Swiss-Prot record:
Protein name: Phomopsene synthase
One Pfam family linked to the record: Terpene_syn_C_2
Enzyme Commission number: 4.2.3.222, 4.2.3.224
Organism: Allokutzneria albata
Enzyme class, first EC level, given as a word: lyase
InterPro entries linked to this entry: Isoprenoid_synthase_dom_sf (IPR008949), Terpene_cyclase-like_2 (IPR034686)
Documented effect of changing L75A: Retains 10% of activity with both Mg(2+) and Mn(2+)
Entry's Gene Ontology molecular function annotations: metal ion binding; terpene synthase activity
Transmembrane segments: none
Ranges in coiled-coil conformation: none
Result for mutant: R147 to K/M: Loss of activity with both Mg(2+) and Mn(2+)
Length: 339
């Protein structure tokens, strides 16, 4: 339950390392208008607080920063999914793991077979999920559909783990699971669906590309922990972010800086022999690093934590041109990225 504090919560983040600038899709406003209309059509803007929470998620900006060159018509499904899944996250984080697992299995099956009729008819998420699944099957290659199903399976399994765990995890355990329940895998799969050409299987599943995908997802997850830290302080929630494992903010930043530095090092090794489809995927992964961070600082999802208190949280961030640390961090679940 949200508890209001007496004054705004202000968090000053240490500078974070980014060697590239933010890139912005030129048709964000169009995608936002379409996405909000889609959410309203399915009843997710029926009261002022709910409408504010939907709008404040800024899903069009999120994907517009991550995929700045995508066809806006193909990217619209990702934008709509973002609005819906941010709303889903708001309610699923408060439920029990058994209920989450049940709905997760039904969502995954619906993505596989839109006419499966396994989602409850009275669930507000059923109709929009079926709509998204139908659109994907109609417009995307079979390889894209399978990757979307697999990535949702991984994400929802991680979300169920987050809901079920009752003890403070080690850093190693936390990083292994965080990249799953942060939703990075389905987000990056939507990158692929926004392109007509499929990244060949032998490329997308190669160890080096898998490492790049995991690195981008882990940086996004850690940065989410950073820019949502003030929200958790304001709501007086237990520490479910990386700082809950015992790391202070400078140590969290040092860890993500190591990963960002390694990402660019490995990306530059992979790009010269990448197919055009893989090169575009790696471009979007690169944009995701800076785009996710800037979106997190901007979105009212974290500055207005419950939709009723605009400006309740202020998170101040800045960017550095040099990493605060480099090299493998000595964490078994991720050290393989440096090998």
């Amino acid at each position: 339950m949200t508890t209001r504090t007496e004054s705004p919560t202000v968090v000053q983040l240490p500078p974070v390392y980014f060697p590239t600038a933010l890139k912005v899709h030129p048709q964000i406003e169009l995608m936002e208008e379409r996405g909000l209309e889609w959410m309203a059509r399915y009843g997710f803007c029926s009261d002022p607080v709910q409408a504010t929470r939907v709008r404040d998620s800024r899903s069009a900006h999120f994907f517009g920063y991550l995929c700045p060159k995508a066809d806006p018509d193909r990217l619209q499904a990702a934008v709509d999914w973002g609005y819906l899944m941010f709303a889903f996250d708001d309610v699923s984080s408060d439920g029990d793991s058994s209920a989450l697992l049940d709905i997760a299995v039904r969502i995954v099956r619906t993505l596989e077979a839109p006419d499966a009729n396994v989602l409850p008819s009275d669930n507000p998420y059923t109709a929009p999920i079926v709509d998204l699944a139908t659109r994907v099957h109609r417009t995307c290659a079979p390889e894209h559909v399978r990757r979307l199903v697999d990535s949702h399976t991984k994400w929802l399994l991680g979300a169920a783990w987050e809901c079920a765990v009752r003890q403070r995890p080690s850093i190693n355990d936390y990083l292994s699971a965080r990249v799953m329940y942060a939703g990075a895998e389905p987000t990056f799969t939507w990158f692929q669906l926004s392109e007509a050409v499929v990244v060949p299987e032998q490329e997308i599943t190669s160890p080096r590309v898998r490492a790049l995908t995991e690195m981008a997802g882990t940086v996004a997850a850690i940065d989410n922990d950073l820019y949502s830290h003030g929200k958790e302080l304001w709501t007086r929630q237990s520490r479910s972010d990386l700082s809950g494992t015992g790391l202070d903010l400078p140590s969290c930043v040092a860890l993500r800086d190591r990963i960002v530095a390694r990402f660019f090092e490995l990306r530059n090794e992979v790009l010269p022999t990448a197919s055009p489809a893989l090169a575009r995927y790696l471009h979007n992964l690169t944009c995701a690093l800076r785009g996710n961070f800037e979106w997190g600082l901007e979105t009212e999802r974290y500055s207005n934590p419950d939709g009723n208190h605009p400006g309740a949280v202020r998170t101040l961030g800045s960017v550095s041109n040099t990493p605060s640390a480099v090299g493998p961090p000595g964490i078994p679940s991720i050290d393989w990225w440096w090998r």
